[in-house]
């Protein structure tokens, strides 16, 4: 039937019902081809992924609030197309932090947070997936890294607790997360945390995947 009423995002922002947002497009590829003509393998190439990480860790200081000083910066989410892609980004980011790639964490960033970015990854791990064993093995390493960073003790048997802890560190609603040692800067996801997640300190959603459904983006 005919539309009875329409309430747009623009009107909701004006009414203060939702927060405003700004979309920035960044091109990490130099090519004359249209996006549809670029093979998916290009987006899985390490050089491309390094450009994306450089855009996040060194060229987004203002969006992440580095001008506010130690312990007052915002955090962010990076969403990618698949679990293997998320795992690849996580592993590559560890190498960037270790100084093993051409992309380095800039001195301007280190002056504020020498340990930036403190990152983790979250995705569903099930027994029924064909590549479940690989996903579980990778998640075990993620948990080891996380436990070492934050002095926690999560295991594969307590992924629910791990995910809750990640959510809390992103939201920073508890006083203890006001201290830098307890803060998380970046979480890499596929579909998690994209809808219905309230995190006042989360300023930026980095999207490295094909266009998402509008309802997912707006939420």
Regions found by a protein language model. Give the residues of each.
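Signature of the SF2 helicase/ATPase Hel1-core->accessory helical subdomain module
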Residues: 1-40, 49, 194-219
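Conserved C-terminal RecA-like helicase domain
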Residues: 40-189
């Amino acid at each position: 039937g005919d539309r009875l009423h329409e309430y747009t995002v623009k009107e909701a922002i004006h009414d203060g019902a939702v927060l405003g947002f700004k979309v920035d497009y960044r091109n990490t590829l130099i090519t004359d081809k249209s996006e549809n003509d670029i093979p998916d393998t290009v987006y899985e190439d390490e050089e491309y992924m390094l450009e994306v990480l450089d855009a996040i860790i060194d060229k987004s200081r203002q969006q992440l609030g580095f001008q506010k000083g130690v312990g007052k910066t915002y955090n962010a989410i990076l969403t990618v197309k698949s679990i293997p892609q998320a795992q690849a980004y996580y592993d590559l980011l560890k190498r960037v932090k270790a100084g093993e790639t051409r992309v380095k964490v800039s001195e301007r960033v280190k002056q504020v947070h020498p340990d930036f970015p403190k990152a983790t990854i979250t995705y569903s791990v099930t027994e029924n997936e064909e590549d479940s064993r690989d996903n579980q093995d990778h998640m075990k390493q993620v948990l080891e890294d996380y436990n070492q960073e934050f002095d926690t003790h999560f295991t594969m048997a307590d992924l629910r607790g791990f995910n809750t802890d990640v959510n809390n560190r992103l939201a920073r609603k508890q006083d203890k997360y006001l201290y830098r040692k307890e803060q998380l800067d970046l979480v890499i996801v596929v579909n998690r945390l994209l809808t219905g997640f309230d995190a006042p300190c989360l300023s930026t959603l980095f999207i490295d995947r094909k266009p998402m459904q509008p309802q997912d983006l707006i939420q």
